[in-house]
Amino acid sequence: MKTIGNRYVVVDLEATSTGSKAKIIQVGIVVIEDGKIVDHYTTDVNPHEPLDAHIKELTGLTDQRLAQAPDFSQVARKIFDLVEDGIFVAHNVQFDANLLAENLFFEGYELRNPRVDTVELAQVFFPELEKYSLPILCQELGIPLKHAHTALSDAQATAELLLFLREKMAQLPKGLLERLLEMADALLYESYLVIEEIYRNQSILTSPDLVEVQGLYFKKTASPLETRKLSQDFSKNISLLNLEMREEQEHFAKEVGLLLKDEPVSLIQAPTGIGKTYGYLLPALSQVENRQIVLSVPTKILQNQIMEEEGKGLKEVFHTDIHSLKGPHNYLKLDAFYRSLQENDENRLFRRFKMQLLVWLTETETGDLDEIGQLYRYQHFLRDLRHDGNLSSKSLFVTEDFWKRSQERAQACKLLVTNHAYLVTRLEDNPEFVSDRLLIIDEVQKVLLALENLLQETYDIQSIIDLVDKALVGEENRIQQRILESIRFECLYLIEQFQSGKSRKNILDSLANLHQYFSELEVEGFEELVRYFTAEGDYWLEATETSQKKIQISSTKSGRILLSSLVPDSCQVLGVSATLEISQRVSLADLLGYSEAKFVKIEAHKKQDQEVVLVKDFPLVTETSIEVYAKEVADLLMDVQAFQQPILVLFTAKDMLLAVSDLLPVSHLAQYKNGAVHQLKKRFEKGEQQILLGAASFWEGVDFSSHPFVIQVVPRLPFQNPQEPLTKKINQELIQEGKNAFYDYQLPMAIIRLKQALGRSMRREHQRSLTLILDRRIVGKRYGKQIVASLSKEATVKTVSQSEVDETIDEFLNEL
């Protein structure tokens, strides 16, 4: 046998199934020597059994074609001769290698080649990607894949991927490759052989674009380019960005310009889909010369989106110095990561994650962990690696620290982009953060919730139990022991009561008991919990975002914080939204503490490309069990998916979303199941799945612009939960003022949320969408007329029976 060196044999098999009884139906082999493709081979194989319809559709193979193909025994020798002396490479190597080895074994050949998996190599060397299937990798890296699920085409693409990976490795410093090799036992197969080959031939010289500190390699920070002056003419700036200006956008930008000239505090309302972001940024950048502009958006998803889209355009065309600032926990703490590298961790997944981070450090300019594509897989390890906002003067990475760097960039840049949660937290600590600056708040109505969150505190109940258990071990005072035991009992009781859905009164009684016990507790280390449980305020239980089994206790202080109380007078404020008007008797400006703010409204025109369909005979959501209603929704989605159009389903509750997800028999994307919101958005936009089930920020914090047509489904009207702290407080305020909390606030807010939902899929001209509202209260309740009247101003509204839904969608799809 020849010496195994840098000869790679890339194999792809098509088979009758992916199970243990799979039979080979097609073989594709590509041979790489000295970094070049030198040979290829392909053959069909007769499985002597009919193919499933799914396999026929996937591969394009037919029973008739395979009936003419050779048996595996007739091609086994040729295949073995090709693969015998090489390193076996495949995408998901376990399937191909095991199936081929088994078939060769029955023909008298033993396949014992080392194995390389291009999936795990791609995960390490392309850490920013979210999916690692062969078609998606080819799409991301520009590798041709003409006939997916054809063995030779897939093998050719996998070979090109391997060559791409080798090139990527060759660009990395030798010291980094050495460190990766030291950790390569985290890889499942012999994939380290590829790294080892590149390492042997690698120069010891480090790339001039990288700097080495304590064995870590960082991308050198580029100096900002000299900013280009923007024109006072909005249309010229839009033209330079290679964009088409819309009439409504120009009108909006003109109004923004006037407000920035004359008004210290102003609010402007404009319809969705007109290009509001450029509409306020370009006038601001052209008019505000000697002040920094701070832009706050509702979510980190939108923050990232602006940096990737508008921010990228502003940097490229105008060299605008723009920076994105988030809370410290969003950044990698280098000291913590460095310490973790010194530890001999036995967890294979964590070691592989550390390999990813080592590569990522050579690429990132920000250290923002959101850049890592599959971050959700590593949440368990991130707790100790996230930045805590503190930096010791003795740190090994004082200069490179990402949080410190981000703070410095935030001070120096022209345009600072942040999110509402970080903005209000920072303002509470230091109002000077926006002194003498222009503060633009997009979706300004969402600041109300961010301000409410400042008043809230949350503790994980199991963490309290763990702390009590530790204290009980060393506590000698008998009375304090009893108090700790009582606290432990009440915590366990709360978990049991919440998970079983028992009486709310029992929970309130137990919370009252905890208040009493903590007021008597004098054990060291419990000071924060004593303060928390003895403070005045409302308390409630809820499951965490990540798990229904993890229960947390939350509280809110009485009263509300007004935005005006946090923002200094020297700061100019511009609030922007598609939905600022609440009702005739309730003003958002009043709720924010800016009753004197100038208000401008850009009237919305009725969109011809948008239709709202009300289903009048769907089961009544308030009188139907969650199981039955979820089944009805799932059945409707199965009918609608036959139109082969993207479907976005917007839920108001996590339990309903998960119930529908469990019942859907087709592959789909679901929030709380398939990764972070921004990852789901990207996967849906790329067409990876036809159906996306979303809640929370999908109503108003995520935009979909890539699909020319989207079907939206709203199973339930988005009324705010009257028990939510913010809603409860505002309701109480309005009642004290003699107003009707439902008609003056809750109903208008539901209409606002519906309109925001309609705007998710109307982000550009000629984009079309149809929204199905299944909650029949909209046609049966008195307040439904108010909702319909408001929606009718912006879109065509139809009322149909469930049996007419398919026909209605078909008609809309076929309209010019």
Per-range role (PLM):
Residues 87-94, 98-104, 133-195, 771-773:
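Acidic, Mg2+-coordinating catalytic module of metal-dependent nucleases/exonucleases
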Residues 235, 291, 300-304, 308-413:
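A substrate-engagement module of RecA-like helicase motors
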Residues 617-625, 676, 680-775:
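Conserved RecA-like P-loop NTPase helicase motor core
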